[in-house]
Amino acid sequence: MHPAAEHSPLGKSSEYVSTYTPSLLFPIPRAAKWAELGLSADTLPYKGVDYWNCFELSWLLPSGKPVVAIGEFSIPADSPNIIESKSFKLYLNSLNQTPFDDRATLEATLRTDLSAAAGKPVGVRIRSLQEVEAEGVVALPGVCIDDLDISVDSYEHPRPELLRCDASRVVEESVHSHLLKSNCPVTSQPDWGSVVVQYRGAALDHASLLAYLVSFRQHSDFHEQCVERIFLDLQRLLKPERLTVYARYVRRGGLDINPYRSTETADFANHRLVRQ
C-alpha cells in the first residue's frame, strides 16, 4: 500500500458532507509509485493524462432547484499527485446542497480545487446528460485478443517475462483486451478494465500479451500505476518508435478512471465503452 493512502478515507467509514468542502480532497504523491518503477518526475518516458468521469454530479441553482450533469476531469500524468478516489467522491458529493450561480462558476470552482490537489492544472468539463447520451458507446480500436487460447497458472504479480516479440518484423498495429483486472491496494476491491496497446515496433506476440495482462489479476495497485507498468514493460521489450497504452476502467462510486500513457502527444478521445 502507498504510505499516504493509509491516511486517506479509502476503506474507512466516512461522513457524507452535503455542502461544499474542498478540504475533503486527499492528494497522494506519485513519487513513491514512480520510484517503484525506476522513474522520477524528471525521467518520465511518456506523456499522458488520467481522465476521470463523474456520473453523480449535482448542485443547486440559486433558486434551490437541483441540477444533474456528468463531469469530465483530466489530470496530467506528470502532476505531482493523484487524487484519492474516495476523497474525490466525497468532495463531489459535498456539492449536492450547494448553490452556484451558473455552470461556469461551478467549473471554475472545480478547476481551482482539483488543480490545487493535483499540483498541476486540471481540465474540467461539465456536460449535459443529453450530450453524453447522444455519443453512445464505442468499440476499442484494433484487434481483440481475448479469444486466443492461452494457459494461465499465475495471477499474483505482473509477469513481464511472459511477453514475446519477433524482432525481425516491424509492424504498426492496435490490439486490445477486456480481461484486465487488478485489485485496489487499500480495500482489495476488484478493478475491472479494458486496455489498448498501439505501437510501431517489433511484432508483439498477441498470446503472450494476453497472458501478461491476465497476470495482473490478483495484483494490488492503483489504476494509473498498472497502466504505467504495462507501458514500461512493453517499451523495454519492443523498443518501439511509438507506443501508447491506455485503459478504461469500470466505474465505482459514480467515478471511472481512464489512464492514458504515450510517447506521442496526449490526444485522448474520452468515449465510453459498453461496460462504462
Swiss-Prot record:
Q: Which InterPro entries match?
A: GTP-CH-I_C/QueF, NADPH_dep_7-cyano-7-deazaG_red, QueF, QueF_N, QueF_type2
Q: Name one GO biological process term.
A: tRNA modification
**Top enzyme class of this protein?**
oxidoreductase
Q: Where in the cell is it found?
A: Cytoplasm
One GO cellular-component annotation of the UniProt record comes to:
cytoplasm
Q: In which pathway does it act?
A: tRNA modification; tRNA-queuosine biosynthesis
The record's similarity note reads:
Belongs to the GTP cyclohydrolase I family. QueF type 2 subfamily.
Among NCBIfam families, the record links this protein to: QueF
Name of the protein described by the UniProt record: NADPH-dependent 7-cyano-7-deazaguanine reductase
* Species for this entry: Pseudomonas fluorescens (strain ATCC BAA-477 / NRRL B-23932 / Pf-5)
Lineage of the source organism? Bacteria, Pseudomonadati, Pseudomonadota, Gammaproteobacteria, Pseudomonadales
